[in-house]
Design a protein with these regions (language model features):
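Glycan-processing catalytic domains of CAZymes
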Residues: 1-212
Length: 212
């Protein structure tokens, strides 16, 4: 991993790298697919991809804002029908669609890619993606099927999410901790709290239930 994004990013120290590698070996030994996204650019991306492949990961590099589709073809691009994570050879994470001025331009840009796995936000503006829109995104441009996943943060709450209550800005509930200085509008969540769990799952209005 790298401590900072960009072409001049410096690697983590050896102790940190070994700790992370030890954690990631556990799912690998259990036969699970492991995905790595490093915030790097330029020639560093190829290094990340090759390093990940050597370690048994599906690894890629990208901008930390996660707001663009790379202007390069996916690594190991293929026409396979991908229905399980163990079949995935490449992936794209795009969580911030602000560069796409219309809903259709956003969906069109995603549908014209050949990634085996797309990880996107449930919402564009203030409306969740519809069943028809998600079905559209489950097809690669080359005709193969792919997996579509929705991002959901468990460790942080955000004031732009539909569960947010305006009163929390002045007085945060006990399960809502300090703001994240690197991401305005985001707050650390005490993820073990039942009140936070109730917002995330278990009712028709809960975030995970909307995804499902």
């Amino acid at each position: 991993g790298y401590e900072e994004d960009g072409e001049k990013a410096e690697r983590n120290d050896a102790e940190t790298d070994e700790f992370l590698a030890a954690m990631l070996r556990k799912p690998l030994l259990a036969g699970k697919q492991v995905f790595i996204l490093d915030y790097v650019k330029g020639k560093k991306i190829r290094h990340v991809q090759e390093w990940g492949a050597a370690e048994g990961y599906i690894a890629d590099g990208g901008d930390r804002l996660l707001d663009v589709i790379p202007d390069r073809r996916p690594m190991n691009e293929n026409t396979n029908n991908v229905t399980q994570l163990k079949q995935v050879k490449n992936f794209l994470v795009l969580l911030n669609p602000e560069h796409y001025k219309t809903r259709e331009s956003y969906l069109k840009a995603l549908s014209e890619t050949n990634y085996d796995l797309l990880i996107v936000d449930l919402y564009y503006d203030d409306r969740p993606l519809s069943r028809e829109e998600t079905e559209r995104l489950k097809h690669k441009a080359n005709g193969g099927r792919r997996i579509l996943l929705s991002y959901m943060s468990v460790g942080e709450a955000a004031d732009y999410r539909p569960y947010w209550q305006s009163a929390w800005t002045a007085e945060r509930p006990h399960w809502l901790a300090e703001p994240n200085p690197e991401w305005p509008g985001s707050y650390k969540a005490r993820y073990w709290s039942k009140e936070w769990h109730d917002l995330l799952y278990g009712s028709p209005d809960a975030y995970l239930d909307k995804i499902m």
